[in-house]
């Protein structure tokens, strides 16, 4: 009897140890609230909107200890609309992220649908990623700092941190037989995070970026399953839909002193290789600069403010499109997992841009993620609640 009890205890201890070597975590965010747009194609818009501060999601994250410091990892992350229950990211089951890989003391290699290096290293320094949500992102999220687009079929390496310094890279296979370079996406980035100072730099290059009707929908044997997200923003949609190459160079930094953090970002976005329209054999360039400020007024209350300026290219002598944008935010934490927030954004546009047909038109204000204004000005306000689990 004693031997049987000892055997059961030993077996239970062994099973517990084996179980501890692997784990699967269910996590998620539910972000919901009221949003106001003072000019949605010429009309006021009041309504509920899901996922403004952060996209509503749930996911599974797992790891298995393989021994010797090597681990198998995976992430499957779904995006959804709280108001309708519909899938986000073009209807994909795991449209936000879906990858599997190996992690070791020498770095992590993952394969699947993932974020590019600009998102990883520069995106977190933008106001939209910190406290402003997607409506505080740069116009149309033209530099993808706010991860409007993911990369399919991607192989990615991320280094460990060396005294605060880390780096990484991503390459996405084009998936077109006989045309190795077509539809490919590649990206490189590096960052430094040590004490009060955070720095980031990144590069992104995508061939035929809007192939199959949406940014980065590359290399699928059945393109209808790749989560089409048509580029409809009037800020750069006409360029993205006809360019052969989309290129982003981004950099940013932030410094914390006491309860305050001041930061800045810069991006240079180019659309190259046009075959039709006013930019044939030319390059359309957008430069964006942002300064942002965050203040931890109390352990539960964060205040934020940001200003960013975007300038596009001149179109055959016409004045370049220019976008001035200011954002304010207040975020109050009811607990570690639940907060309520208020965000306000104002944008003013001037100059000229292209419409969907390639015609030169006056630039209109277009706050990211919202219906564009019918004039040069637009105001948006958001009151929301976010719960993490």
Protein language model annotation of sequence segments:
Residues 1-21:
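Gram-negative bacterial Sec-dependent N-terminal signal peptides
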Residues 43-46, 86, 142, 174-175, ...:
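Extracellular loop and loop/strand-boundary signature of outer-membrane beta-barrel proteins
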Residues 22-36, 46-177, 182-205, 345-349:
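Outer membrane beta-barrel
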Residues 191-327, 331-332, 346:
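Detector for outer-membrane/organellar transmembrane beta-barrel domains
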Residues 40, 86-88, 121-127, 211-215, ...:
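Outer-membrane beta-barrel and related beta-rich outer-membrane complex signature
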Residues 50-53, 90-92, 147-149, 180-182, ...:
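Short sequence motifs at beta-strands and strand-loop junctions characteristic
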Residues 334, 375-389:
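Outer-membrane beta-barrel "beta-signal"
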Residues 9, 59-61, 99-101, 156-158, ...:
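Outer-membrane beta-barrel architecture
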